[in-house]
Amino acid sequence: MSVKLKADEISSIIKERIENYNLSVDIEETGKVISVADGVANVYGLKNVMAGEMVEFETGEKGMALNLEESSVGIVVLGKSSSIKEGSSVKRLGKLLRVPVGDALIGRVVNALGEPIDAKGAIEATETRFIEEKAKGIMARKSVHEPLQTGIKAIDGLVPIGRGQRELIIGDRQTGKTTVAIDTIINQKGQDVICIYVAIGQKQSTVAQVVKKLEEYGAMDYTIVVNASASDAPALQYLAPYAGVTMGEYFRDNSRHALIIYDDLSKHAVAYREMSLILRRPPGREAYPGDVFYLHSRLLERASKLSDKLGAGSLTALPIIETQAGDVSAYIPTNVISITDGQIFLESDLFNSGIRPAINVGLSVSRVGGSAQIKAIKKVSGTLRLDLAQYRELQAFAQFASDLDESSRKQLERGQRMVEVLKQPPYSPLPVENQVIIIYAGSQGYLDDIPVSAVTKFEAELYPYIEAKYPEIFEQIRNKKALDKDIEEALSKALNEFKATFSAE
């Protein structure tokens, strides 16, 4: 039996096949390594590569295109460059760097690419985000108005921090900068704030100690640690803060609150300088490249308090800068001071004289935190800054003058006690209601007849006494967030009763 084929049927089938024919050809643009040194590869042949694009070397190492020149491309290697040789092939990946974000990262230690380095298995993240994002515009933001309590009396009373603020912690080495940051993380327990600690160029042992301390206080339950240590490639140290802020933005954009600590941006700038000089970019002041200001401004501008329309989430940044011999007028410190909303200045002289945290009250300032402070602490610490400044002035004068008048002597004695009140051991942040009570006691003269050496003992015994006899004082300050007449009367009564039973010995 013969099958008759109609010509029009055949032509329609052929036509359909031609129309549906899908020729997908994978065109991979590859290049060759001309030279490689110090974590930077010079590559020839990647004519269409974009700035910031990811590439892959034949050894499996990833890289990022940073310098686009006429005949070659400068690529920073994200990992070990020792296996890459001259003549190795490099292929474009056609994508920008992304890092995993979300709740799966909480409690983990990751590198600058978001890969786990804590031997606790893979991270099951459901979402990734670009590492470089544009900071939110003016209309997307809201002014800072909620407090972010650090648990440190000197900070919450004198240089308060609000959610969505950028507050710089600046000081010489060994002045307790990291301790202030860790105390702040520990104090966020139960506050529904996700913390991100970014370690840049630190020793592995130092980072291990920080993680151990956070675990000890149960803070790793709400903390992500991003580590690009001193032994990592400069490119990873450069990327670590951007990876951290990307993870923080996820929580901010989902109507949650996050806190990010960059420890520290001095080493970040040094890593960027190292990369830039190897890429042969022209050096500027202190051999830093011309765009080192933009390096930090685009990072810190990503911290913000979002408007109610966008969910009212917040991302607070606490960058750390290490100064050399207290020189805050160096290039990187002045840059970051001008970008942030205030600074907490730690001094080695204060630290060595036993005043810890070693905060210089005169030089420390919070430009927007005042509007975020709760009324109670604002009331009790209102004149504290002025009193301490006058005390410091009198103290300098008293070294030369032996006969002081009665009011000056009283001011000097109260100042000594207030300095004692503001001292605090590390890793012991105080709830805000406790801070209100002790600062009130100091500023209202309840400590004037207590020996200076007994102030710490007075404070340690005061809280349990009030908790046992007048628990409503704590509760009312916590709930009302203000110090009204009734609370003040009850507090005054409690302090007088406690003083009658207190023994300085």
From Swiss-Prot:
Note whether Membrane occurs among the keywords.
Answer: yes
Kindly provide the name given to this protein in its UniProt entry: ATP synthase subunit alpha
What sort of enzyme, by top EC class, is this?
translocase
Gene label:
atpA
This protein's UniProt keywords: ATP synthesis, ATP-binding, Cell inner membrane, Cell membrane, CF(1), Hydrogen ion transport, Ion transport, Membrane, Nucleotide-binding, Translocase, Transport
According to its UniProt record, the EC number is 7.1.2.2
Q: List the disulfide bonds.
A: none
Q: Which family does it belong to?
A: Belongs to the ATPase alpha/beta chains family.
Gene3D superfamilies from the xrefs? Answer: 2.40.30.20, ATP synthase alpha/beta chain, C-terminal domain, P-loop containing nucleotide triphosphate hydrolases
**Annotated GO CC locations:** plasma membrane; proton-transporting ATP synthase complex
